[in-house]
């Protein structure tokens, strides 16, 4: 093993001995790239990563505890529970010695108590839904989370000790890990959550307090466990809450605990709590069964290696003979590559996070939250951006897998090798789809702008999204008059067995046709255009990422690319022909496309909902069909309140968002300085600054040992991208929150 370096970074003797500031930048950049550290073995790599998972969980629990604690300490939770639609939830108090009298007044809510920050996280709604009612409940939760964080920190430390370090074979035992994750993590946690909803949340929603003092003695259902053991489970669905049920009281409450109602509670405008308990119980059963499917020590169940080996349709069947070796070789390829596993996990989590954004408002699970428009907008935007980062990360680690871990011999002629073999077809198809979407969508928008500008708006090209309307109608939306499937009571979807036994959720049709609901919003020509603009963004981002990954090992222009590693700069033909970019450069380009695409997604969602919330849907419908409409009637019009947060006449409670809006723009613009200027400029700038520093009295008392050198090209791009990203998100966050909050008071 190499001798440990005596100064930062201790994990790299090579970097630690570098006489320039490169030591610091590269040290920070590679601190988490454990694979490249001195003396790293595969077993130590897995052990270190395993321990970091515990540290990561500890940080998450600590952060969550802080949120809960500050709401209990400085929030207004108990007052809010008494009037959830009339009181603004408080995240925490603000103490700032620079606040003048006007600022103190602006950020103090009616009733006094000093300046506070409004909560747009949705936590209040979650607490209320799951049965927490007092600050004491919140303090107990915060302390519980702190204790959990301590347990996880200890577990992380423990698993680094020689006696408790798992072996490499333990980490490579895929079947056991899959069983544990399916049954132990997903299954049992879903069962526990169903238990909490049934034993605590549902009784609290009906005005019956359940706490640590009585939860073991309070029956959640009058019939107890008798229906469970006599297989008379339908009893638990009988007598659900009525449409007149008043949240938190016995008025209009039923006794059911596991229902299949569908739709929303009209009082809270959220999913029925008893439906959600049923859902989690069903998920628990499915996952606990799934967690017993794979073969471990007992010689029963599936072997994933055997399944993958046999996963190849024989000749004469559909796709027969078209997959080569099929999935042979994939078991070891996936099981021996952490990057492959991480790429799969990030892709799945990215999709799930985007679905959460969508479902959290359309099928709102939290009581009264759909009436808090700012929180709805903040949560949608937050989850869509996170989904974007996760998806780009999935492709990045997929590319690193291909550079570092892919073994062509072990994957001969299997599906993975065949994807690489016909990458030209994949890339060219994505390319023409992107070109088609881009030119046609932009062409329609620009045509419509010209018609508006020339005074002939009736000549706009407006296309009804008939296929999307058909899909909405088939799910039961009546507004289009299409009479298809669920929107036609005589269709086979409505009458086929066993639907006469009322298998369709009875509340679904009412919910999807509620003019004030958010399920399957009515769509028209503006939606058609922006859907295709978003499709352009998604396909172009995918094109860049897929090309970057599939060309990561080599390409026509640069067949030996894998020998250069994952990240090298595209710097023109003068530096040895790195024109054909590295996978890192593809990731870098894709980040801009991802951010812009999610910009369009959130612009669309926000503008459409502002119209619904304000009762003026015509503005979106009429002005979203041309570009000036988006710039003028969405961005400019909704910035008006925001940029008047402070002006020559004073300030109001939007001032902090106005300041953040400006600050976000400045951070974003700073990024361009790094993105546009190349390396020579930075080196000259640094030399000049060092020269001035060394000749300035007092300043020249401070010296540094490392010789200052400019950032590398890749580092300059990274710094530029970081500023662009952070500034972009800060700017839009301030815009969404301030514009929505100003409209909804």
From Swiss-Prot:
[4Fe-4S] cluster binds at residues 570, 579. GO terms for molecular function: 4 iron, 4 sulfur cluster binding; chlorophyll binding; electron transfer activity; magnesium ion binding; oxidoreductase activity. GO terms for cellular component: photosystem I; plasma membrane-derived thylakoid membrane. The keyword Oxidoreductase applies. Chlorophyll a B3 binds at residues 673, 681. Its main location: membrane. It is an enzyme of class 1 (oxidoreductase). Keywords: 4Fe-4S, Chlorophyll, Chromophore, Electron transport, Iron, Iron-sulfur, Magnesium, Membrane, Metal-binding, Oxidoreductase, Photosynthesis, Photosystem I, Thylakoid, Transmembrane, Transmembrane helix, Transport. It comes from the Bacteria. It is found in: Cellular thylakoid membrane. Phylloquinone binds at residue 682. Chlorophyll a B1 binds at residue 665. It is a multi-pass membrane protein. GO terms for biological process: photosynthesis. Disulfide bonds: none annotated. It catalyses: reduced [plastocyanin] + hnu + oxidized [2Fe-2S]-[ferredoxin] = oxidized [plastocyanin] + reduced [2Fe-2S]-[ferredoxin]. Pfam families: PsaA_PsaB. Its EC number is 1.97.1.12. The chain crosses the membrane at residues 49-72, 138-161, 178-202, 276-294, 338-361, 377-403, 425-447, 528-546, 586-607, 654-676, 718-738. PSI electron transfer chain: 5 chlorophyll a, 1 chlorophyll a', 2 phylloquinones and 3 4Fe-4S clusters. PSI core antenna: 90 chlorophyll a, 22 carotenoids, 3 phospholipids and 1 galactolipid. P700 is a chlorophyll a/chlorophyll a' dimer, A0 is one or more chlorophyll a, A1 is one or both phylloquinones and FX is a shared 4Fe-4S iron-sulfur center. Belongs to the PsaA/PsaB family. The PsaA/B heterodimer binds the P700 chlorophyll special pair and subsequent electron acceptors. PSI consists of a core antenna complex that captures photons, and an electron transfer chain that converts photonic excitation into a charge separation. The cyanobacterial PSI reaction center is composed of one copy each of PsaA,B,C,D,E,F,I,J,K,L,M and X, and forms trimeric complexes. This is Photosystem I P700 chlorophyll a apoprotein A2. It comes from Synechococcus sp. (strain JA-3-3Ab). The lineage of its organism: Bacteria, Bacillati, Cyanobacteriota, Cyanophyceae, Synechococcales. The gene is psaB.
